[in-house]
Design a protein with these regions (language model features):
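Conserved short alpha-helical segments that host acidic/polar catalytic motifs at enzyme active sites
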Residues: 1-154, 159-219
Length: 219
């Protein structure tokens, strides 16, 4: 990373949930279109992918992967053609999505993060010196020497550019529905998620389980 040039970057470690575990489905996805280039990294699952994909196919889209992430990227690119800004295109696309997701989208001059309205999937913001970082977990910030600032709120979109950070909460509904599987399985023990330490959550969950379903165990 130190040898790379530029002031914006995007990366992804894929946990296969949609599409086969093949190189073609690796992220980030990079698109070249009439407005330039666009890169997208996505964590989550959509429940209306077939409808969104069919809409694109009817307009001539040709897909190179079997992921719902490519469907999202195509919609952002398509909306960008008819929008004044990338942020506007992202918001238009996000309003079409049904499911849980955390997105990081990179244009030549901006890094945009958006979290689904219910906060099913996590996304957080960190800072190292004069550099801002978006990640699914706080432990990812630690690994690059960044300090955790805060969680991105459900329905919030964050834009990072040379002008600093801007927040947009147009997608927020005021309702939260965090995925319990993040706390018991997906997240790393040393992560902090929506104000909760993952390690503590698992300890408390285990105690609650033992009270609800006590068993005679030889430990």
């Amino acid at each position: 990373i130190r040898n790379m040039e530029g002031d914006l970057g995007i990366g992804h470690v894929r946990y296969s949930t949609t599409g086969a575990s093949v190189a073609e489905n690796a992220q980030p996805l990079v698109l070249s279109y009439i407005k330039g280039t666009l890169a997208l990294a996505h964590n989550g699952n959509l429940i209306n992918t077939p409808e969104l994909k069919w809409e694109l196919i009817q307009n001539g889209a040709i897909f190179h992967t079997t992921t719902d992430s490519e469907v999202i990227a195509f919609h952002v690119a398509r909306e960008r053609v008819h929008s004044k800004t990338v942020e506007e295109a992202v918001l238009k696309t996000a309003r079409k999505l049904k499911g849980g997701y955390a997105l990081v989208i990179m244009s030549p001059r901006k890094l945009i993060g958006v979290r689904d309205p219910l906060g099913l999937k996590p996304l957080c913001l960190g800072k190292r010196d004069n550099t801002y970082v978006l990640a699914s977990e706080s432990c990812a910030l630690t690994s690059v020497g960044a300090e955790f600032i805060r969680d991105i709120e459900p329905g919030e979109m964050i834009t990072i550019s040379r002008n600093g950070i801007e927040s947009n909460k147009e997608l927020s509904t005021g309702k939260h529905a965090h995925c319990v599987f993040e706390y018991i399985y997906f997240a790393r023990l040393d992560s902090m998620m929506d104000g909760v330490k993952i390690y503590d959550a698992r300890i408390r969950g285990g105690k609650s389980l033992a009270k609800s379903y006590p068993v005679e165990a030889d430990l």
